């Protein structure tokens, strides 16, 4: 180890260099002046250690500079190899306490506060406490020569230990400068071995003052291990030859963060440093800049310099030393003993050093090997990269070329394989053909020939199959054993010794040579001639013997696979060949050269290898052919030889068999002939019958056509007469917007009725049944239709007059004009708005009022079919106001509306016409009985003072109280939402038709919902005399327009035009875009969603459970029972599309609780505040009797029977307690045992109190205690004051270094992140929000000890519910925090923060209960995920949403989602009570903070004004598109000023798409019928009820399966056409099944349309119980008891829907 100037330790904090003389004075005892011991005690053994220096380390020079610079902290490896400039001043960012201007002087004995030892100077290193150091050796022991002063050169650097055990370590020589904070200081092992580490304070003898020695003189001999060096004095020896100092090695510059290590530069001793370490005593103490601070820290003046010895003292010392030298008798013995011990120690040290050096050598070799390996690895990688750059493209191209070649070979193999497969197929076909010919052949020879051909073809096919199975085998891959690792070095390489392609197997012999056509033909001719000769009995011409002898000597060997061998024998020539010898004198022939012989030999080899196998193959084939021919000849010869044996009685038997066969064939022929004749005759008869039926059907069709034409003409005439007076078309056209109105087409011509009379019909009125449509002429039918139409008008007017006729004469006004109650023509008088109406009617509403008044004047009923939202209610109220104001007709008026709109009718009548008295007729039976007292009078005259004018009720109550309503005579009956009476077979329709009323007005926004039959029901209701229940008219409405639209488009268009003209006089319809200019647009948008993984799994499972064949069967021949089954499947599929949680909810789960809980009593008695007690107890209980648990059984529980219970506490905690305040004070005064209290900022009382508390209480006290010491880092932030610590807190090192105040000062920004790195990283990692991977399978409270004692219960409660402990862990409650704030308590008195740390998991927190994830709840449904993103955008845009659903359970799930997203919402469905609906709608209209309104499409789609919303979302569409239109018009109606956007959620590729397509078709039907346009492109094919099942089956299948269903249906229709009897039987069965079956698709479409106030099975609480007669009850009960009848409870879906709609009698 070199001790050159480059290895000098440097001071990272000292501002200036120390002089070399000062260093020498500090470290070299020989150059130190005599005096008292310094204040530090550096340990070193008294005897220097021998120089056990390794051989590779040069000896150090013993110059004073070397001695001074060799001691100190060993440098890092990087520091040993780096040289630095000598005059560079070190700079560093670390604080050096030795460079403080207020230098602390060494403490003296007078400055200590204890008499035991002097206080050492306080050093402030980078660590706040001293490092681990060995204790000071004891000088009293006998063997103190070697007591641990030696340390291993391989010194471990451990982090500093705890400051508790080393609060005041023994002094040691501090390092010359403060070391780098990265590693603790370590002494140089070389200097310690050489005895250079001892200080003057470790010398046992007093140091005698000596003269200073020159710098070139060493302080010891060169060899410190010499015996003379041990016994010699400290006198200087002769100067040895100086060793050359190695040149400092200057390495490359390091990073900027490491400052260069400067070389200590000697300075003149006259310029002492102003900032020196307190370790080195300065000759002149400098004046401190801050004396007050040093005084506060307990520092005193330095010790005065000791006086030198006098001459007398020196003389006495010399005398004593001479006396000692004169007694040498024991010196040799002591020397020998010391030498032996020294040699023992030296040997031990040598072995240790060798062991260490050996390990270091291995480590260096390993490091060098790794270094070289890394270096070579870099070269290898560089070479690989270079190779890739140079050869990479070529290698890639070669690989690509090989791949292309391999692909070509593969394609060739595939082609070869296909050709072979084709060959096999052709051979098998030839075999089949040959077998067929053999079966068909009459001759045995031909049959055998074909059989041989079949065998030959089969053999070829088998051979080809074998070749296909064997395939083309490539070269075999040899198994190469893996190479063993090379442990000897050198390079290794492998190569293939033999090329696998070089030893190929010999190829198979080629095929036999192809024959020419002439040869083949000659062979065929010879074979045919041989066959003819054989047939004639002659012997065929065989091959000559001489031809067979050619191959006599050729013997083929058995051939094995892959081996071809031939033996050839050549006959010797008959005559010897004379060989002429060449003359030696002849010239050299050119064929006698070596090349010639090589070529000659090669030719023979080629002949032997190639040509000989071919010849052998030809020979073998020829031999096989010859043997086959011989075999055939032998067979034929044997047959000819046995021909005489065939002459037997076989011919007679064959003749009899032939005769029997002919007889059977003749009999079958005549039977077949007779059957064909009979079938032909029957077919002719059947054709005649069919022709007759067809002619009859044509006649009936013509008759029905004329009958229908008569009915339509009659209706058209009636409409024409009424239209002239009502002028509905003018009313509609006058209110059309010119920009959007549809212009009249020229071809949309009205029927030409000519000049029709206005008065009474001159012709005779003919009943419909009396007309003969076969004999009558068209003119006669037209005249009868005109007469009937005029008669119908006259009957309507007479009926109106009869209703208004009273007992007295009709009232006339003063001018004698006719009263309005007497119907008459009013001409073109325009009616003004009534003054009673407190509202301003719009133009189109005033036109509607004129139209309604004209209807009333003519005594004709009508349908006001304005689009929803145009004010049909206001127009109806204005009619009643007009009648009351102009003509004094104050009622009674009857308004029947759905239950959801009753409040709306009452409010609007009261609001617009306050003078009209409204009687709300709903409630319980008792309430309605009281209400009937106001109007149940026979001769009441309704004037302005009448008890009521308008009665408002619902459809259900009209049906239930029909007996009371029929007693009244109603002036005007208004039916709101008239589609409720669309069924003419329901009891509701029949009951309302039987009311006595002058006029009926139907209000509906959708007159056509599902089919034309509904429109027919409405027309029949308003004009029973004209639109009566003729089957033909009903047939025309329901079938001709719908079913024949596809087949007869022209007829369909004509009928639609005529239908539109018929409807014109009775129905007034305006559309929003035509009449309401200020109404915003309505935009409809379909949002397609995809199924999630969970939904697809559910959907696939449902599809897999459906049998497609069953669907096809049900779709073709099924009835309504099958419809119910299919509808159940449809509902399941719709549930999957909405949300999979409709099938199975993700439940809240928790581990098994191995405990039981107390049962709670009734909460009804507890009031609003319920006390929930802790009652969880383990299933395992440890029961103890009271005698053991409370009465003397426990040793720690004091009592009258346990006198020894408090002995331990009394002795240990009271008598022997060293923490008592008195003991602490006395100990501090006497021996100073508690003297450290003054440096810990702790009082005696605090220490005594802490000793009596447990760990938790002490932790609480620490939290409450203010931590102000760490704030000094903020106050004292200068460099020189950075480590300032008050004296009273000197030992509170951790609190002084606390960084929390710095973090509290910076609450935000990057500095805050730096102080909270762990917290910031944890938060960004997302670990706290991750789902838990596992959880315990079971939990249980701790096992408790049970005892029948109140004291045991109290003790357990105190343990479990410790209030102070809970308050410390959880902090104050929110109520207490609020009280502290409201009371304005100072923050100093606030309770401490909660001590319980935050949970690691933000989701799970401290519990194991797992709640279903709402995020997964959203993402499990494709619809809900789309809706989530859509609602976020709508919320940001300030929109308000109406959200419609079909399923109540889906609304429940949506409520959970809205709660999760914190959206405010309201809900209205069928279960909402009637009185709550008004308040709910009012809240949504008046409170803008409500974002979403959840509605049921059936319950919330009628009679509600929700114009405050501008967005409508259909989560799932209704079966009936009209219901959706009514629902969206709740927002898009009169009063809406914003644009309304309608979103419809549809799941792609599911049943919802097919339902939506069907709904669009129905909407198109409505548009065509209402507008009267062309309907050629409209699908009117709504199937009949008998085959309605097909529509549902089509929803459940895909396109291919739908095509299969269509095909099966076509086959069924063809079968029914061919077998009419079977089809009639099937229809009968279907009809019977229909009567007992469930609901059909039609019922599904109409589901809930009439029961508007109830969208679910739960009653709303407002319905009235229906009274049933006793006789009916009795009859029903008897039927039930007999088993033949059904209970009153609806069993099928159809019955339930009918009851809900009121279509059937409740009895």
Curated annotation (Swiss-Prot):
Residues 61-75, 266-281 have a biased composition (Low complexity). Residues 78-89, 101-126, 516-526, 729-756, 1643-1656 have a biased composition (Basic and acidic residues). GO terms for molecular function: ATP binding; ATP hydrolysis activity; ATP-dependent chromatin remodeler activity; DNA binding; histone binding. It is found in: Nucleus. A motif (DEAQ box) lies at residues 976-979. Residues 603-728 form the DBINO domain. ATPase component of the INO80 complex which remodels chromatin by shifting nucleosomes and is involved in DNA repair. ATP binds at residues 866-873. Its EC number is 3.6.4.-. GO terms for cellular component: chromosome, centromeric region; chromosome, telomeric region; Ino80 complex. The modification Phosphothreonine is found at residue 178. Keywords: Activator, ATP-binding, Coiled coil, DNA damage, DNA repair, DNA-binding, Hydrolase, Nucleotide-binding, Nucleus, Phosphoprotein, Transcription, Transcription regulation. Pfam families: DBINO, Helicase_C, SNF2-rel_dom. Signal peptide: none annotated. Residues 505-515 have a biased composition (Basic residues). Residues 853-1025 form the Helicase ATP-binding domain. Belongs to the SNF2/RAD54 helicase family. Residues 369-470 form a coiled coil. This is Chromatin-remodeling ATPase INO80. GO terms for biological process: CENP-A containing chromatin assembly; chromatin remodeling; DNA repair; positive regulation of transcription by RNA polymerase II; regulation of TOR signaling; subtelomeric heterochromatin formation; telomere maintenance via recombination; transcription by RNA polymerase II. The gene is INO80. Residues 15-44, 90-100 have a biased composition (Polar residues). Residues 237-247 have a biased composition (Pro residues). Residues 1426-1586 form the Helicase C-terminal domain.
């Amino acid at each position: 180890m070199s001790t050159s100037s480059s290895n000098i330790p440097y001071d990272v904090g000292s501002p200036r260099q120390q002089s070399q003389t000062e260093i020498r004075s500090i470290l070299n005892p020989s150059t130190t002046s005599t005096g008292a011991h310094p204040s530090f005690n550096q340990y070193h053994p008294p005897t220097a250690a021998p120089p056990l220096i390794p051989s590779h380390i040069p000896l150090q020079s013993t110059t004073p500079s070397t001695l001074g610079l060799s001691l100190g902290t060993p440098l890092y490896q990087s520091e040993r190899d780096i040289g630095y400039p000598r005059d560079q001043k070190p700079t560093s960012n670390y604080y050096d306490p030795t460079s403080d201007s207020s230098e602390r002087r060494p403490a003296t004995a007078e400055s200590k506060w204890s008499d035991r030892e002097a206080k050492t100077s306080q050093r402030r290193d980078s660590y706040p406490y001293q490092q681990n150091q060995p204790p000071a050796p004891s000088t009293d022991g006998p063997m103190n020569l070697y007591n641990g002063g030696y340390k291993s050169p391989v010194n471990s650097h451990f982090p500093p230990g705890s400051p508790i055990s080393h609060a005041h370590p023994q002094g040691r020589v501090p390092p010359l400068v403060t070391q780098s904070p990265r590693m603790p200081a370590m002494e140089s092992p070389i200097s310690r071995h050489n005895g250079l580490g001892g200080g003057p304070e470790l010398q046992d003898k007093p140091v005698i003052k000596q003269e200073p020695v020159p710098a070139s003189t060493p302080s010891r001999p060169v060899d410190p291990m010499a015996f003379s060096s041990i016994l010699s004095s400290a006198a200087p020896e002769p100067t040895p030859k100086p060793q050359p100092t190695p040149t400092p090695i200057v390495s490359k510059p390091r990073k900027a963060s490491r400052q260069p290590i400067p070389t200590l530069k000697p300075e003149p001793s006259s310029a002492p440093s102003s900032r020196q370490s307190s370790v080195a005593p300065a000759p002149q103490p400098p004046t401190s800049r801050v004396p007050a601070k040093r005084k506060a820290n307990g520092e005193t003046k330095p010790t005065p310099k000791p006086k030198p010895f006098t001459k007398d003292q020196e003389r006495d010392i010399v005398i004593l030393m001479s006396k000692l030298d004169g007694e040498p008798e024991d010196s040799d013995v002591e020397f020998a003993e010391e030498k032996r011990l020294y040699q023992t120690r030296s040997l031990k040290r040598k072995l240790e050093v060798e062991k260490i050096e050996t390990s270091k050598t291995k480590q260096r070799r390993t490091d060098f090997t790794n270094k070289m390996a890394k270096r070579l690895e870099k070269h290898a990688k560089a070479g690989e990269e270079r190779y890739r750059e140079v050869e990479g493209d070529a290698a890639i191209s070669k690989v690509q070329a090989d791949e292309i070649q391999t692909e070509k070979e593969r394609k060739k193999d595939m082609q070869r394989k296909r050709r072979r497969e084709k060959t096999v197929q052709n051979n098998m076909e030839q075999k089949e053909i040959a077998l067929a010919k053999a079966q068909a052949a009459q001759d045995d020879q031909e049959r055998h020939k074909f059989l041989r051909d079949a065998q030959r073809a089969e053999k070829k096919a088998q051979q080809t199959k074998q070749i296909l199975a064997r395939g083309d085998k490539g070269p075999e891959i040899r198994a190469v054993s893996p190479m063993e690792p090379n442990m000897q070095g050198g390079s290794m390489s492998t190569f293939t010794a033999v090329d696998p392609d070089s030893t190929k197997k010999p190829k198979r012999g080629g095929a036999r040579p192809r024959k020419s056509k002439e040869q083949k033909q000659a062979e065929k001719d010879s074979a045919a001639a041989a066959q003819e000769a054989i047939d004639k009995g002659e012997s065929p011409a065989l091959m000559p013997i001489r031809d067979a002898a050619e191959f006599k000597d050729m013997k083929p060997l058995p051939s094995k696979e892959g081996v071809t061998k031939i033996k050839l024998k050549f006959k010797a020539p008959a005559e010897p060949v004379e060989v002429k010898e060449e003359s030696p004198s002849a010239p050299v022939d050119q064929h006698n050269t070596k090349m010639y012989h090589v070529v000659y030999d090669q030719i023979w080899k080629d002949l032997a290898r190639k040509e000989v196998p071919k010849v052998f193959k030809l020979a073998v084939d020829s031999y096989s052919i010859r043997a086959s021919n011989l075999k055939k000849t032998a067979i034929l010869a044997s047959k000819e030889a046995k021909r005489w044996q065939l002459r037997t009685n076989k011919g007679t038997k064959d003749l009899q068999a032939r005769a029997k066969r002919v007889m059977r064939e003749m009999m079958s022929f005549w039977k077949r002939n007779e059957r064909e004749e009979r079938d032909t005759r029957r077919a002719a008869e059947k054709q005649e019958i069919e022709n007759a039926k067809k002619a009859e059907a044509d006649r009936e069709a013509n008759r029905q056509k004329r009958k229908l034409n008569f009915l339509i003409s009659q209706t058209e005439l009636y409409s024409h007469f009424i239209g002239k007076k009502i002028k509905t078309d003018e009313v509609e056209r006058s209110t059309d917007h010119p920009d959007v109105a549809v212009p009249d087409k020229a071809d949309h011509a009205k029927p030409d009725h000519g000049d029709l009379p206005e008065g009474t019909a001159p012709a005779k009125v003919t009943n419909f049944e009396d007309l003969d449509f076969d004999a009558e002429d068209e003119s006669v039918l037209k005249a009868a239709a005109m007469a009937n139409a005029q008669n119908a008008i006259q009957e309507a007017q007479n009926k109106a007059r009869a209703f208004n006729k009273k007992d007295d004469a009709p009232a006339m006004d003063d001018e004698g004009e006719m009263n309005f109650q007497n119907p008459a023509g009013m001409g073109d008088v325009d009616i003004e708005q009534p003054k009673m109406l407190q509202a301003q009617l719009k133009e189109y509403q005033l036109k509607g009022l004129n139209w309604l008044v004209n209807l009333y004047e003519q005594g004709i009923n009508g349908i006001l079919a304005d689009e929803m939202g145009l004010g049909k209610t206001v127009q109806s109220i204005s009619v009643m106001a007009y009648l009351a104001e102009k003509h004094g007709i104050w009622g009674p008026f009857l308004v029947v509306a759905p239950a959801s709109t009753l409040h709306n009718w009452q409010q609007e009548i009261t609001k617009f016409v306050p003078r009209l008295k409204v009687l709300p007729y709903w409630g319980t039976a008792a309430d309605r009985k009281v209400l009937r007292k106001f109007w149940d009078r026979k001769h009441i005259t309704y004037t302005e003072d009448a008890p009521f004018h308008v009665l408002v009720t619902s459809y259900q109550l009209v049906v239930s109280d029909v007996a009371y309503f029929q007693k009244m005579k109603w002036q005007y009956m208004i039916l709101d939402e008239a589609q409720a009476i669309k069924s003419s077979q329901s009891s509701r329709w029949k009951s309302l038709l039987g009311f006595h009323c002058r006029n009926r007005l139907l209000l509906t926004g959708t007159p056509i919902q599902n089919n034309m039959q509904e429109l027919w029901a409405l027309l029949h209701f308003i004009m029973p005399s004209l639109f009566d229940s003729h089957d033909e008219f009903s047939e025309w409405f329901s079938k001709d327009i719908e079913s024949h639209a596809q087949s007869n488009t022209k007829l369909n268009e004509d009928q639609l035009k005529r239908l539109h003209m018929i409807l014109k006089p009775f129905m007034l319809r305006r559309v929003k875009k035509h009449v309401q200019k200020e109404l915003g647009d309505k935009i409809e948008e379909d949002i397609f969603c995809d199924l999630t993984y969970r939904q697809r799994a559910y959907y696939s499972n449902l599809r897999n459970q459906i049998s497609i064949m069953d669907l096809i069967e049900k779709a073709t021949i099924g009835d309504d029972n099958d419809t119910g089954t299919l509808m159940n499947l449809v509902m399941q599929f719709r549930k999957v599309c909405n949300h999979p949680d409709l099938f199975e909810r993700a439940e809240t789960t928790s581990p098994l609780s191995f405990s039981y809980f107390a049962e709670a009593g009734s909460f009804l008695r507890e009031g609003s505040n319920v006390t929930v007690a802790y009652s969880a107890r383990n299933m395992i209980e440890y029961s103890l009797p009271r005698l053991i648990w409370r009465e003397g059984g426990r040793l720690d529980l004091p009592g009258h029977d346990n006198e020894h219970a408090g002995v331990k506490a009394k002795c240990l905690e009271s008598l022997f307690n060293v923490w008592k305040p008195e003991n602490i004070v006395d100990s501090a005064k006497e021996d100073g045992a508690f003297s450290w209290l003054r440096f810990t900022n702790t009082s005696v009382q605090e220490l005594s109190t802490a000793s009596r508390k447990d760990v938790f209480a002490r932790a609480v006290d620490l939290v409450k205690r203010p931590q102000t010491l760490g704030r000094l880092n903020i106050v004292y932030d200068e460099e020189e004051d950075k480590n300032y610590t008050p004296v009273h807190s000197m030992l509170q090192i951790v609190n002084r270094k606390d960084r929390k105040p710095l973090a509290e000062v910076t609450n935000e920004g990057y500095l805050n992140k730096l102080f909270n790195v762990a917290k910031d990283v944890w938060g960004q990692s997302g670990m706290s929000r991750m789902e838990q991977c596992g959880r315990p399978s079971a939990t249980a409270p701790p096992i408790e000890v049970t005892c029948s004692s109140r004291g045991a219960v109290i003790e357990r409660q105190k343990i479990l519910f410790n209030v102070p402990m809970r308050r410390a862990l959880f902090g104050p409650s929110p109520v207490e925090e609020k009280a502290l704030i409201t009371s304005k308590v100072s923050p100093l008195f606030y309770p401490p923060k909660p001590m319980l740390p935050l949970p690691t998991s933000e989701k799970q927190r401290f519990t194991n209960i797992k709640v279903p994830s709402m995020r997964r709840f959203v993402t499990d449904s494709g619809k809900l995920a789309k809706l989530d993103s859509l609602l976020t955008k709508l919320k940001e845009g300030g929109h308000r949403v109406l959200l419609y659903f079909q399923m109540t359970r889906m609304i429940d799930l949506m409520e959970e989602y809205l709660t999760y997203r914190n959206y405010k919402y309201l809900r209205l469905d069928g279960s909402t009570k009637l009185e709550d609906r008004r308040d709910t709608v009012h809240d949504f209209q008046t409170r803008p903070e409500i974002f979403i309104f959840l509605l049921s499409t059936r319950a919330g789609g009628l009679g509600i004004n929700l114009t405050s919303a501008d967005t409508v979302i259909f989560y799932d569409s209704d079966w009936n598109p009209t219901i959706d239109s009514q629902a969206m018009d709740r927002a898009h109606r009169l009063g809406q000023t914003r644009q309304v956007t309608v979103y419809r959620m549809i799941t792609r590729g599911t049943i919802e798409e097919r339902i939506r397509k069907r709904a669009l078709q129905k909407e198109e039907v409505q548009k065509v019928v209402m507008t009267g346009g062309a309907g050629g492109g409209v699908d009117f094919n709504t199937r009949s009820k008998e085959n309605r099942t097909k529509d549902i089956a089509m929803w459940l299948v895909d396109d291919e399966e739908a095509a299969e269903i269509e095909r099966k249906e076509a086959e069924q229709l063809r079968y029914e056409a061919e077998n009419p009897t079977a089809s009639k039987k099937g229809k009968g069965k279907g009809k019977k099944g229909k009567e007992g079956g469930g609901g059909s698709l039609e019922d599904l479409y109409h589901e809930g349309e009439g029961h508007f106030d109830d969208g679910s099975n739960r009653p709303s609480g407002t319905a009235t119980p229906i009274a049933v007669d006793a006789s009916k009850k009795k009859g029903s009960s008897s039927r039930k008891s007999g088993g033949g009848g059904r209970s009153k409870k609806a069993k099928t879906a159809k019955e339930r829907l009918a009851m809900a709609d009121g279509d059937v009698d409740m009895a």
